[in-house]
Amino acid sequence: MTLQDAFDLFRRLSVHPEMMSRADFSAAYYRLARRYHPDVNPATHELMANINAARTVILQSYRRPS
């Protein structure tokens, strides 16, 4: 997954990580995780896997110097 793909996924979920601090992004991720977690809604298993992959890519971009 590319960084652009990760941004696109979160934008579709109404989260705009490119305009957030890392702390704000983490809070937004946890809100999504509570909403789409497979234990809460089994039909969202694949979506949650994509959210987790996108989160990993975006967090790596926060760690890299610009």
Model-based region annotation:
Residues 1-43, 50-65:
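N-terminal J-domain/J-like co-chaperone modules of DnaJ/Hsp40 proteins
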